[in-house]
Design a protein with these regions (language model features):
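Transmembrane alpha-helices of multi-pass inner-membrane enzymes
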Residues: 246, 401-451
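Loop-to-helix entry and N-terminal half of a specific, functionally important transmembrane alpha helix
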Residues: 37-43, 218, 222, 387-416, ...
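Transmembrane alpha-helical segments and their membrane-water interfaces
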Residues: 70-81, 102-160, 199-202, 411
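Hydrophobic transmembrane alpha-helices and their immediate junctions
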Residues: 251, 259, 367-410
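A membrane-periplasm/extracellular boundary helix in multi-pass inner-membrane enzymes
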Residues: 158, 253-307, 322, 326-329
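N-terminal signal-anchor transmembrane segment
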Residues: 6, 11-79, 97-106, 159, ...
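Long extracytoplasmic/lumenal interhelical loops at the membrane interface
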Residues: 170, 183, 309-368
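Alpha-helical transmembrane segments of multi-pass inner-membrane proteins
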Residues: 143-171, 186-255, 382
Length: 451
């Protein structure tokens, strides 16, 4: 099967990647796609229904997301398993088994196990979906979930505009509000921000499908609006990586063969990233000044330091990581089985309340011990390798943007526990990350076969 992208024909054939018509059991494929639709319905309810904390949508996600995952696993195991599918199922099963073991050990100690369903869904369904469903070329499931996250970006923009205009409905005021001077939705500004970054990334993936100038102009304006709402969250790490995402996408679009075009693409990307970063800081200062002028000192609950302080201690992250090291030193049992009390342990070693380690890999060490950290590192290496290969060959804009988005999510996870854990409010980020990771692996295999 051949595909034409921008006039460049590529052969996209790989023996392990089968379409729904080519498999021995098309009924199993329909169940796999149906399972993804079930997850999308749960995610859609989770995104729409506010306030979610201990509410119906939160419960649906936490309890019932295991159902589509189990249906998917059953359909996958009922069909023929190629080696890539088998390898990813084994890796996901290893992650799930160790997660279950640690939760069982914690349960023996009297701690209630939670979020098992969403973790099972993440590693039992989202990670192997692209290979197991043979969707690497058709991308039907990918289009569905990207459409959902595109709608989420629009929803967050609507929330931000309503908050700026002071017209948030009463039933949303507990979920959409100013956290000090920061725009907060989806439970916290630091959760809202990466979801907006994902919305921007999905919008960039649509670029190659728009052929008319006015369509692309509207898309640029829409991305600008999302970036403006992202600035309101004051999530500086996410803002930086969103600038990298936009600049990297421009680089991939302009990059051609030859050193001159390569240099021009690099220069354009650097100028765009620098301009966006400087502009975001200027707008953030103006917004903060206006908010502080309109609110009393008692209403400003959230205080953030300037960039000068952030460069020195990464907004207190270095102190938190030092506390995590001391906690591991004084509680070596964590290295074996993890703990449910990471926040309490970390708070003993610093002067402020800490709920987690503010690093995905350090947090998974606290949650699941060294075996969990090893599995997370293996997945990280594979994902980074797949993304870098796709960026190097730059086969088509959508794939390059997907690779950039995955790397940017990893970058944000260096300062927040977005990945590898069982925090409910962060599962939408992890779902998309793992799903995209599977597609990147499929596309890298296709690219290798075509060479």
């Amino acid at each position: 099967m051949k595909a034409n992208f921008g006039g460049i024909k590529m052969q996209l054939e790989h023996p392990s990647v089968k379409t729904i018509e080519e498999v021995e059991n098309p009924a199993a494929r329909r169940v796999q796609y149906g399972s993804l639709i079930g997850l999308l319905v749960l995610l859609g309810c989770y995104f729409l229904l506010e306030y979610r904390g201990n509410g119906v949508a939160w419960t649906w996600m936490e309890v019932y997301s295991v159902i589509p995952a189990m249906l998917f696993m059953g359909a996958t195991l009922s069909g023929g398993l190629t080696r890539p599918v088998r390898n990813r199922l084994i890796f996901g099963a290893a992650f799930l088994i160790w997660f279950a073991v640690t939760k069982a050990l914690h349960r023996i100690e009297g701690v209630e196990a939670r979020s098992i369903g969403v973790f099972f869904c993440a590693y039992g369904m989202c990670l192997p979906f692209a290979w197991a469903s043979g969707d690497g070329k058709r991308r039907r499931g990918l289009k569905w979930i990207l459409g959902l996250y595109l709608g989420l970006g629009a929803l967050l923009v609507l929330y931000g505009l309503m908050l700026l205009g002071g017209c948030v409905p009463g039933y949303l005021r507990d979920a959409v509000y100013w956290d000090g001077t920061r725009f907060s939705a989806m439970s916290h500004p630091n959760v809202c921000a990466p979801l907006l970054m994902i919305g921007i990334g999905v919008s960039l993936m649509c670029w190659g499908r728009l052929n008319k100038v006015w369509q692309r102009v509207l898309l640029i304006l829409w991305i600008g609006v999302q970036f403006g709402v992202l600035i309101l969250t004051s999530a500086r790490t996410t803002i930086v990586f969103t600038c990298v995402l936009l600049g990297g996408s421009l680089f991939c679009a302009l990059r051609k063969s030859g050193w001159k075009r390569f240099a021009i693409a690099c220069l354009a990307a650097v100028v765009l990233m620098g301009g966006l970063f400087v502009g975001s800081q200027m707008l953030s200062k103006v917004h903060k000044t206006n908010m502080e002028a309109s609110q009393t000192a008692g209403e400003i609950k959230n205080i953030q330091y300037g960039w000068g302080s952030d460069i020195k201690n990464l907004n207190n992250r270095t102190e938190i990581w030092s506390s995590a090291r001391k906690g591991l030193r004084d509680n070596p049992r964590i290295l074996l089985e993890g703990t449910e009390y990471s926040g309490l342990i970390l708070s003993q070693y610093n002067s402020f309340r800490v709920y987690h380690a503010h690093n995905s890999w350090l947090q998974v060490l606290y949650d699941m011990g060294l075996p969990g950290l090893l599995l997370a590192l293996v997945l990280t290496v594979v994902v980074v390798y797949d993304a870098l290969v796709l960026l190097w060959y730059n086969p088509e804009p959508m794939k390059s943007v997907a690779a950039l988005l995955v790397l940017c999510i990893l970058g944000c996870s260096f300062l927040e526990p977005y990945l590898f854990g069982a925090y409910m409010e962060k599962q939408p980020i992890q779902f998309l990350f793992l799903l995209l990771s599977g597609y990147l692996d499929c596309w890298r295999a296709e690219l290798r076969k075509s060479k």
